[in-house]
Amino acid sequence: MTFNEANTVEAFIRDLLCGGVTDHTAAGPGLASHNSQLAGLGWHYLSHHDLPRQPQEALVEDHLRESLIRLNPAIAANPDRADDVIYQLRAIIMGVRSDGLVKANEAFADWLTGEKSMPFGENGEHVTIKLIDFDDLEQNQYVVTQQYTFQAGPITKRADLVLLINGMPLVLIEAKTPVRASQSWLDGALQVNDDYERNIP
């Protein structure tokens, strides 16, 4: 067998997170388990083919919509409201090119940390929107996937591993092979900076 990034470092990290790949591809809320024991670090593995998204979409909107409904009673009362929140998040992502990465990250972080609200309450009162449940972590959906492709115009990039929480890609991992001395962690860091930060929101 030829050793490469996919079957050494990438597979090791994936298996550490999810306890190994199985035929089971359902990824509901809560930590992954097998026979009532935590699987790896509790992440569910889904192949990038099994994620309901197009390459030009940064978010896995079906998963995000389900999470918004599950975590927010005001959205559960009217599930169409989830689309209003997704629209706001999409606008931040699409604004990266004009507003800059730092400003977009700050705006998205405000949503992630529960600092944003929408007029979904009684008489149009603003209620805080939860994208992640920090109080009950079992309410969140944790997915690790490999070869997550994102296309921005003519540019297509593929990350080795991506960690998604509630349909949002929050961690990008660029694995480098331990068997090629010419590749190091610095190469991975430069690739993330040069390829992803400059070209992909």
Describe the role of every protein-language-model region.
Residues 1-201:
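An alpha-helical interface "stripe"
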